[in-house]
Structure formats: C-alpha cells, structure tokens
Design a protein with these regions (language model features):
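Conserved ABC ATPase "signature" region
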Residues: 97, 101, 107-122
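A short, surface-exposed alpha-helical micro-motif characterized by mixed small hydrophobic
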Residues: 192-194
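Conserved ABC transporter NBD signature motif
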Residues: 58-73
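ABC ATPase "signature
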Residues: 210-211
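Catalytic Walker B motif of ABC-type/P-loop ATPase nucleotide-binding domains
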Residues: 151-155
Length: 235
C-alpha cells in the first residue's frame, strides 16, 4: 500500500487552475522529493493532502484514507508548511508544550524532540529571537511530537546554512531508516539529489515524471532532468 496517494487531484481558485490532474503515489519508508517550478502547484497539493484546502475534483489519501478520516492524526502524520506559526513571546520549549497539551501528548516528549532536532540549548530562548534556521528546527520538533508515521515538509531547508543542510539530510535519512515516510518539497535540487530515494516532478499542476532518483536522472544530474521536464515554464 502506498503511504500517500494523489488521484487526479485538481484545485481551482476562481478561474485559476493551481493543480490539474495530479496523480502520484509515495512508497512507505522512503524519502520522496516533490519538485516543480514556482507556481507548479506543490504547496496547493500539500494543502489538499492535509485537508487545508478542498480539492475541486480528485482525491488524496494518507495511509489509505483521507486526512479527515485519520484516527488520532498527530500520531499518523506530522507536517511543516510554515516555520512562522509560533508565539514569539514564548520560548521554544513553551511553544512545544502548548502543542503537546492540546494533543494530549506527555511533556516528556517535548524534551525528546528538542534533542532530536539539536535545539536543546536554545529551548528556553523566546521564539521571536530564533533565526530562520532555528525556527525550521522548532517546526520539525513540533511535527515529530506525535511520533508520526508520515512527515510532510515544505521547503524544510529554508534558512539553514550548509552545516544545517547537511544535518537535515542526515536527519531525514535516519527517520526514513526508522521506517518513516517523508514527502519533501524543495528548490534545492543538488541537495535533493543526495537526500531523496524517489522524485515526483510536477509542472502546471500535473505530474511530469515519477520514479527513483536513479531512474529520473540517469547519468546526469537532477537539475538537468528538472530543466528538461519543466522547459518552457514561466517563473
């Protein structure tokens, strides 16, 4: 069974088609990169997947069901779509404790996820003083609170320096080795080539290619394959 499925997904905002006939599946226990030019429909597709936007037609499934039908969704799926969704006046630890309390997750889990993302030393600092990279780590910690089976990450490397990007690569590989399924969108093609197992390339809201990283790039690079498959796009 695929961990995540998009079936003929379409989404219109007024007369604008953000996504059209997107069909793709994501295998369990792998890191899959969702790639496409600006405006290709990546973020809208993820929002439909997470029940934050209603599809015009088609459907999405996580672990075989629509997001709204998941039982205890925080233990099934964690998501990072925006690293700015924290209370700036609270510390990193306090923000996570609020999230944990709302989901009836033990406080002890907060310290566990802070350690996982290497944010223990900044845990008692107010979130408004966090760098963008630190906010990304805090967002990852929040997504991991429920120890979910599936992670959805939209541009998780934003704001990370080269050391942070290398850390993120190893971190995601470790999570996948533990059996978690990870769907990640990113513009950092060179980094994605060294991180993901599979790739979905979309353009104009449609799937242009899907397969293993080796199948997609052949003897070339991910950037070369991406540019070939999205030729003619307006950015």
């Amino acid at each position: 069974m695929a961990a995540i499925e998009f079936s003929e997904l379409a989404k219109k905002y007024g007369k604008v088609r953000s996504v059209r006939r997107l069909t793709a599946s994501i295998a369990e226990g792998k890191i899959t990169g969702l790639l496409g030019p600006n405006g290709a429909g990546k973020s809208t597709s993820l929002r439909c997947l997470l029940g934050l936007a209603k599809p015009t037609s088609g459907s999405t499934k996580i672990l075989g069901v629509a997001y709204k039908d998941l039982k205890n969704p925080l233990s099934q799926i964690g998501a990072v779509l925006d690293s700015r969704g924290f209370h700036g006046g609270l510390t990193g630890r306090q923000n996570l404790k609020v999230m944990a309390a709302a989901a009836k997750i033990p406080d002890s889990r907060v310290d566990e996820v802070l350690e996982l993302v290497d944010l223990e030393q900044a845990a008692n600092k107010r979130a408004k003083g966090y760098s963008l990279g630190m906010k990304q780590r805090l967002s990852l910690a929040g997504a991991l609170l429920g120890n979910p089976k599936v992670l959805i990450l939209d541009e998780p490397a934003n704001g990370l320096d080269p050391i942070g990007i290398a850390w993120l690569r190893g971190f995601l590989r470790q999570l996948a080795a533990e059996g978690k399924t990870i769907l990640v969108s990113s513009h950092q093609l060179a980094e994605m080539q060294h991180t993901v197992d599979d790739v979905i390339i979309i353009n104009h809201g449609m799937t242009m290619a899907q397969g293993s990283i080796k199948e997609i790039i052949g003897d070339g690079t991910l950037e070369e394959a991406f540019l070939r498959l999205t030729a003619g796009s307006t950015r």
